[in-house]
Amino acid sequence: MSEIVSVSGGPTKPEIIAVSLSKLGLKDGDRFADVGCGTGSVSIEAARIARNLTIYAIDARKEALLATETNFKNFGIENARILAGEASDILGSEKTIDSIDCAFVGGTKNIGSILAKLVEKKARSIVVNAVRIETVVRTIEAMKSLDIFDEVIHVAVSRSFPIAGETMFKPENPVYIVVGKKQS
């Protein structure tokens, strides 16, 4: 099994990916945007859940794009486009991406604009991961203004490690998972 090539700030922890993807409700054949893709680890797991997924991995950081490209190659992810630039610009172009079914947002720069573009692209579900309270508040406000806010989940994971012949837990940084769903 290949190891994920990492970048600063990533990859997203497996437990966070599991909860985030469960909230997305991916279906076979979906068009999936991974905004602020980092290492591409969320896309890799998404591809394991839904067959024939079309992936749009978006990031402005060169190191992230290179890591994603390497990880996609190592994990056999073929039906993916890696897109360089600001997500709000890329999502705003009809030529680049015509529609999106589900989106994971790991990078939260310009979150209001990104969410608006995803709604324009007809995304039925959007999940945003955030670690800062201010980002959570901005995300909730933006989702409410777009009439897509569903819920926020606070996830705190601790990992065991040995100490003095016994086991202790060390907490990871908590993550807020903000969920938006298209209202029927």
Swiss-Prot record:
Pathway: Cofactor biosynthesis; adenosylcobalamin biosynthesis; cob(II)yrinate a,c-diamide from sirohydrochlorin (anaerobic route): step 8/10. Its EC number is 2.1.1.196. The keyword Methyltransferase applies. Keywords: Cobalamin biosynthesis, Methyltransferase, S-adenosyl-L-methionine, Transferase. It holds the Pfam family Methyltransf_31. GO terms for molecular function: cobalt-precorrin-6B C5-methyltransferase activity; protein methyltransferase activity. S-adenosyl-L-methionine binds at T12, G36, C37, G38, T39, G40, D59, A87. The keyword Nucleotidyltransferase does not apply. Disulfide bonds: none annotated. InterPro entries: CbiT, Cbl_synth_MTase_CbiT, Cobalamin_biosynth_MTase, Methyltranfer_dom, SAM-dependent_MTases_sf. It comes from the Archaea. GO terms for biological process: anaerobic cobalamin biosynthetic process; methylation. It catalyses: Co-precorrin-6B + S-adenosyl-L-methionine = Co-precorrin-7 + S-adenosyl-L-homocysteine + CO2. Transmembrane segments: none annotated. It is an enzyme of class 2 (transferase). Belongs to the methyltransferase superfamily. Archaeal-type CbiT family. This is Probable cobalt-precorrin-6B C(15)-methyltransferase (decarboxylating). It comes from Methanosarcina mazei (strain ATCC BAA-159 / DSM 3647 / Goe1 / Go1 / JCM 11833 / OCM 88) (Methanosarcina frisia).
